[in-house]
UniProtKB/Swiss-Prot annotation:
Gene that this sequence comes from: pTKL
Keywords assigned: ATP-binding, Glycoprotein, Host cell membrane, Host cytoplasm, Host cytoskeleton, Host membrane, Membrane, Nucleotide-binding, Repeat
Domain SAM residues, every copy: 300-365
GO cellular component: host cell cytoplasm; host cell plasma membrane; host cytoskeleton; membrane; symbiont-containing vacuole
Protein name: Inactive protein tyrosine kinase pTKL
Sequence segments annotated as region (Disordered): 569-631
Disulfide-linked positions: none
Protein kinase domain: residues covered: 962-1294
Note on domains (UniProt): The protein kinase domain is predicted to be catalytically inactive.
Motif mapping: RVxF motif: 1052-1055
Species of provenance: Plasmodium berghei (strain Anka)
Highest taxon in the source lineage: Eukaryota
Membrane topology designation: Peripheral membrane protein
């Protein structure tokens, strides 16, 4: 959790094996209630007597499992209740004479069986777990008498007379008198009980507050004979009395219903009447009333509605429930399923639908009867005759109109073309006068009033027909007259042959149209805006007139046209074009007004205009993307294309085998769903930090993580390493004071380096976020694992999060699905999180090529010695600044020589690799690099050869791990046997390879372990097992494992990506923690509250607020990330049934049988900045892969315990919600004000015991009172007393006004200018 040296020891007393906080006796021994924190990570909270455990207590181990029991002088009295942190299963271990006798397992606990927990202790009671076979039966009359006796005994202040008359069944008057008297008795008893409760709770709260600073006198009364305090016994009695009084009230109320048997139907008091009497009355009403006018059903009363239901042959219960709820004919129209099932009592879903169907039939019959009464058949026949005559007249007019000649149509077209061209020229002249672009006028609706432009599309279509008469003939009538197409008339449906030909020709010439449109686009992009628009119009008209197009119906405007990429042709001057094209036909392709402005097909009017820079950027980015993403990127750049997806019946298959219809494909292209092929993973975002406990580090110190984790582990090699005093290779020796003394030494002192690295060794923060790129932008990619349960719910949740827009929120750019993974793409923020900014030493991460580092390590000594031989002896006395320059120049020389060295080595490695092909067929890419040529002219010394040989052998062994190209993605692998160092013996015979072979002894041990696991699985299903082990507390882990369900390890999944061979060096920037000013703190707090209040209004259930999710940019603007992750994970099934190996292009899924036959074991090895996957095959070979480890959250809500988690979650009572976010907000406020980590314990079990059960509070020193009150209200242990984020925002605005009055704000704004 925190630092080793940062345990809060102010209120704790240190003993030999633990720290203690609580009550003490005279001898300073634990006496009373207190908390023990053991050095091994365990903790205990309970009662003590003279330093021994005596009473109830909770023991919590490292794994956060709770052991609840009663103690007698450091010995367990009867049983131990064991409960894991992430599960609801409870185990009871029973002890007899110091031995574990048997165990009971309870798989489920209902909330009804749980008793109220004590308010003075956070300890769970034994009565939570009850056996289902036990049933308690009690008499109500005996409870009332016992309750009266217990409540009145030993009361001196008040005396109440209790009647001793028993209940007589014959006397009704005595019943009423007794009932009225007992009500008065209950009221007086309740008042007295409330008064007693207040006293007891005040006394117990005083005890609760005295855990960390109290004396033995305050808890002397809390220890009794049966280990329960005196106040707890009284509280139990009070709770019993309340339950008994409630039962007595119910009995008397039930009796009063039978005594007052008078039924008044006129006053509609049906609830006090029995159902039998109502049924008799309904039957009489139904038999007497026979007239029901269906057309006037809205005027029915409730009795007529019941009569109608009886005629429909439905159960009488339906009629009775309708009669009870006063449902008349007017209310029938407003009934729904919820009201029918919950109010009327018709619970079954099918019967409720049947009831609604009856109401619908009633409406239809009522409408038909009304219509039949008002309809006159003679008038209707006359209406039909007139309608038939109108149809015949229309058909005759259409035949006459189609008989016009083609010459008349051409003349009409030419006249319209001249009028349109004159209007366009006048508009262009107006553009030059006003200095406005032609495109702005179109976007502002300039053409909306011009009716002639509506016919532009028809003119272009007719011109295309005239140009392409040879290729395609216009359909003609019997009189050899061409049909007019100007108004978009449909062809004769009887001619099926012509229709088929037309469809074929349409499909044939669509590609030709696309090419011309894309060519026109690129011509317009290359043209200058300064040229007149007349020239651009003539250019496009010339290209459109020469090209031969097919006839396109106006209905094709709704379909999509994908544009092919063509190289733009150079634009010719106007004179050359007029010579080449003397006859220009002014034809312009256009559409309706809506299609001119909002259409996916780029019209030629739009092509004439200069494009905006955003559209040009989108085209350039689409060209660089892959072929699959080229189409989608062009559509995503234009937002006016939403009217193009009309075909909802098509099915599209994507590369990840997801079949979706075109409506979902619309969201796939335009919305937040991104194809996984367009994502590129660069590296995993891992924050390396060093806690600034000891400020002994210099700011210029450099840490080489690759060296510290990999290359300095072999002590023999490093001890023999020579460091030149003139040019140092080790970064540790350059700056630190201890290494300044070792300037003239020839050999490197490994012990000093090791001690320094222990102090400055960085810690790695776990994350499952990668840095990547999408559409040329840097993004942050979060990896979630699991199969999608319900895609519709998943789609709604993601769309809800995708819509959210706020300046203080990390925006979600999209989501990508690749089973079994879900990738959420956020915007990338470069700076660190709030936690690392406040509490961690900063490092700059510099990414360097892996091969460069390899050759630097391998040949650094050779190059340095060559230079040193040529240098003069005066070189030794050069200053440190000159040494750094020389070191930098030498590295540049190495980089230039790397290619030459690499070419020489490849020629020699080919010969050696051919001999090892038989043994290396499984994975050829993991073959080790042979030692390079060390027999150069300058390396004649044998000692230097031996040193380089040993060093190269070690470097080759490590570097072969990272050289492997078979990067895999593994899912849900589990260990088939436990790892023990003593049992596994690995032979390192293959020095230059990554394989090791097991011995025969280790194989036999593995088989025995597998057989033992099978036996343990059978024992899990038994409810009682006799163990007969000696006394142990807590129970031995082996005994506890008998009863645990043997599940596969599904919390860890290995994710790998195409790795660019790189590692990073980290250079420390600051040696001290960052301290924020008051204005910066208020700015960060305002940003957080604004974001949280916005998310609260958007009804996000859980924000997951914590310091690591608050990101800061360069100007310290706070942004919240990871909100809504809980809702997404609820839609995922993390328990995946299969294991996956995902290669770059395909996915292999195999089951457990395949796993056992081919692979024995898979193990993760953490080596600094790299995670290695070791795969043990059936042939006892080890394959090593370069991977990344991701911590997948479990299905339970208690997956993490940190200092910002609320106490109700620490106890495991409730799931996280906005109340827990308010608690975390208060912790963050305290963290900002004090610049320290709250509850900074070493183990999570210590935090759970102290904060969850011992109720430890935070110190509020040097915090202003107005912020102190806000923090206390947010950290309140009662979650319902915590404020909302809207209320917090109001309070913070008031605080800001107090800190910065109006005069100061005015002065600051004046100084800023």
């Amino acid at each position: 959790m925190g630092n080793i040296n940062s345990i809060q020891t102010k209120n704790y007393i240190k003993f030999e094996k633990y720290y203690y906080a609580g009550d003490l006796n005279v001898d300073n021994l634990p006496h009373g209630r207190g908390l023990m924190l053991y050095e091994n990570g365990n903790s205990f909270f309970g009662h003590f007597i003279n330093g021994k455990k005596h009473g109830k207590g909770i023991y919590i181990d490292k794994n956060l499992t709770k052991y609840i029991s009663k103690w007698k002088y450091d010995h367990i009295s009867n049983k131990v209740k064991v409960k894991q942190f992430d599960s609801d299963i409870v185990y009871l271990f029973y002890y007899k004479n110091g031995l574990i006798d048997h165990c009971k397992v309870y798989e489920y606990i209902s909330n009804k069986k749980k008793k109220k927990k004590k308010k003075n202790d956070g300890i769970l009671e034994d009565s939570e777990i009850q056996n289902r076979s036990i049933n308690f039966e009690k008499d109500n009359i005996m409870i009332i008498q016992n309750c009266q006796e217990k409540s009145i005994v030993n009361k001196k202040e008040e005396i109440i007379d209790i009647p001793n008359n028993k209940y007589n069944e014959n006397d009704d008057t005595d019943k009423v008198d007794n009932f009225s008297k007992k009500i008065n008795l209950e009221q007086s008893q309740n008042n007295m009980l409330k008064y007693k409760k207040k006293k007891t709770f005040d006394e117990m709260n005083s005890l609760n507050d005295s855990i960390f600073c109290s004396s033995c006198e305050s808890t002397s009364k809390s220890i009794g004979s049966d280990y329960i305090s005196h106040f707890e016994k009284k509280e139990k009695q009070i709770n019993k009395q309340e339950d008994e009084l409630k039962k007595s009230k119910e009995n008397y109320m039930n009796h009063s219903e039978y005594s007052n048997s008078s039924t008044n139907f006129e006053n509609n008091k049906i609830k006090d009447i029995s159902d039998e009497s109502i049924m008799l009355r309904l039957k009489n009403i139904i038999n007497n009333n026979t007239d029901l006018k269906i057309e006037n059903y809205e005027l029915w009363n409730k009795e007529q509605v019941a009569q109608w239901l009886s005629l429909c042959n439905v159960p009488m219960k339906w009629a009775l429930s309708v009669y009870k709820n006063n449902i008349n004919g007017q209310r029938l129209n407003n009934l729904n399923l919820y009201f029918i099932r919950n109010k009327l009592g018709i619970l079954s879903y099918g019967q409720a639908i049947k009831f609604l169907q009856l109401i619908k039939n009633l409406r239809v019959t009522a409408y038909n009867t009304r219509f039949s009464n008002t309809l006159n058949l003679e008038e209707y026949e006359i209406y039909l005759k007139k309608k038939m005559k109108k149809k015949k007249m229309r058909e005759n007019k259409d035949g006459e109109y189609t008989a016009t000649t083609s010459s008349q149509a051409e003349d009409f077209q030419k006249n319209n073309q001249k009028i349109i061209m004159n209007q366009i020229k006048s508009m262009i002249d107006q553009k030059n006068d006003d200095d406005k672009s032609f495109s702005d006028k179109i976007k502002n609706g300039f053409f909306k009033g011009n009716t002639n432009i509506r016919n532009l599309q028809n003119l272009v279509i007719n011109s295309i027909w005239n140009k392409s008469k040879d290729e395609f003939k216009i359909p003609i009538d019997e009189n050899n007259v061409p049909m007019n197409i100007e108004k978009g008339k449909e062809l004769n449906t009887n001619d099926q042959i012509t229709g088929k030909k037309k469809k074929k020709l349409k499909n044939k010439y669509i590609n030709h149209i696309q090419k011309n449109i894309s060519m026109l686009k690129k011509l317009n992009n290359a043209s200058n805006e300064s040229q007149s628009s007349n020239e651009s119009v003539t250019q496009i008209l010339s290209t459109s007139s020469e090209s031969s197009f097919a006839n396109i119906h106006s209905g094709l405007s709704s379909k999509m046209l994908f544009h092919d990429k063509l190289e733009p042709e150079p634009i010719k001057p106007n004179k050359e074009k007029e010579e080449n094209n003397p006859n220009l036909s002014p034809i312009i392709n256009s559409k309706n007004e809506t299609n001119l402005l909002n259409d996916s097909n780029p019209t030629k009017l739009q092509d004439e205009l200069p494009k905006s820079p955003c559209s040009i950027d989108s085209e350039s980015s689409s060209e660089k993307s892959s072929e699959t993403s080229s189409e989608t990127s062009s559509f995503c750049s234009e937002h006016s294309e939403f009217a193009n997806f009309h075909n909802n019946n098509k099915i599209v298959k994507y590369s990840n085998n997801i079949y979706i219809n075109s409506s979902l494909a619309f969201s796939y292209i335009y919305s937040f769903i991104i194809p996984p092929e367009n994502l590129t993973f660069l590296y995993q975002i891992r924050n390396y930090y060093v806690r600034d406990v000891e400020n002994d580090l210099n700011p210029n110190n450099e840490l080489d993580f690759c060296d510290s984790f990999n290359f300095y582990k072999n002590c023999e090699i490093i001890k023999n390493r020579i460091i030149n005093p003139g040019i140092r290779n080790c970064s540790y020796a350059s700056n630190h004071s201890k290494f300044q003394q070792n300037k003239n030494r020839k050999y490197f002192n490994y012990s000093d380096c090791k001690n320094e690295r222990k102090k400055t060794k960085p810690q790695k923060m776990k994350s499952r976020v990668f840095r990547g790129r999408y559409m040329g932008k840097d993004v942050a990619i979060k990896v979630l694992v699991g199969n999608i349960k319900n895609f519709t719910k998943f789609h709604k949740v993601l769309y809800k999060l995708y819509i959210l827009r706020h300046t203080n929120i990390a925006l979600i750019m999209g989501v990508s699905i690749s089973y079994p993974f879900v990738f959420i793409i956020y915007e990338y923020i470069k700076n660190l999180c709030l936690f690392s900014y406040l509490h961690c030493v900063k490092y700059k991460h510099i990414y360097v090529s892996k091969l460069l580092k390899y050759y630097q390590k391998k040949f650094i000594n050779q190059n340095f010695q060559q230079q040193n031989n040529t240098m003069s002896s005066d070189r030794k006395y050069i200053s440190n600044d000159d040494n750094e320059k020389i070191n930098f120049d030498s590295r540049n020389i190495l980089r230039n020589k790397l290619l030459e060295i690499k070419c020489k080595n490849n020629a020699k490695n080919k010969i050696t690799e051919k001999n090892n092909l038989k043994d290396e067929q499984i994975y050829s890419s993991s073959t080790s690099i042979k030692s390079l040529d060390t027999s150069s002219s300058n390396m004649n010394n044998t000692k230097l050869k031996n040193i380089n040989f040993n060093k190269n052998r070690y470097i080759n062994k490590i570097h072969s791990m990272f050289r492997n190209k078979n990067n895999i993605l593994c899912g849900n692998y589990y260990y088939l046997f436990r790892k023990k160092k003593n049992n596994i013996s690995i032979s390192h015979e293959h020095k230059n390879s990554d394989r090791t072979i097991f011995t025969n002894e280790s194989q036999n041990l593995l088989k025995n372990k597998i057989s033992q696991k099978k036996i343990n699985k059978k024992l899990n299903f038994k409810a009682k097992i006799k163990i007969n082990r000696p006394y142990a507390f807590p129970p031995l882990q082996e005994d506890f494992n008998f009863y645990l369900e043997k599940k596969k390890k599904k919390k860890k999944i290995l994710f790998s990506y195409l790795k660019t061979h790189s590692y990073f060096k980290s250079k420390k920037c600051d040696s001290r923690k960052n301290k924020l000013s008051d204005h910066q703190i208020m700015k960060i707090i305002m940003d957080i509250t604004l974001a949280c209040s916005y998310l609260e209004k958007q009804k996000v259930r859980w924000i997951n607020l914590k310091p690591t999710n608050i990101l800061l940019d360069g100007s310290l603007n706070a942004k919240i990330s990871d909100f809504g992750i809980k809702e997404i994970e609820q839609c995922l099934d993390i328990n995946i049934d299969y294991s996956y190996i995902v290669f770059p292009n395909n996915v292999i899924k195999f089951n457990n049988k395949h796993f056992k036959n081919k692979i024995k074991k898979i193990k993760i090895v953490n080596k600094g900045s790299e995670d290695m996957l070791h795969v043990f095959s059936s042939k006892n070979h080890i394959y090593k892969y370069n991977t990344r480890e991701i911590n997948v959250s479990s299905n339970t809500h208690n997956s993490s315990v940190f200092f910002w988690t609320s106490p109700e979650i620490l106890k495991g009572k409730q799931s996280p919600s906005l109340y827990s976010d308010v608690y975390a907000y208060g912790i963050i406020l305290w963290e900002l004000m004090t610049n320290s980590v709250p509850f900074n314990y070493r183990f999570k079990s210590h935090l759970l015991a102290s904060v969850g059960y011992a109720k430890e509070s935070l110190p509020f020193q040097n915090i202003p009172p107005f912020i102190k009150n806000l923090i206390k209200s947010c950290i309140n242990r009662n979650k319902y007393k915590r404020p909302t984020f809207d209320r917090i925002l109001i309070e913070i605005s008031m605080i800001y006004e107090q800190i910065n009055p109006k005069e100061e704000d005015a002065l600051m704004s004046f100084m800023d200018g």
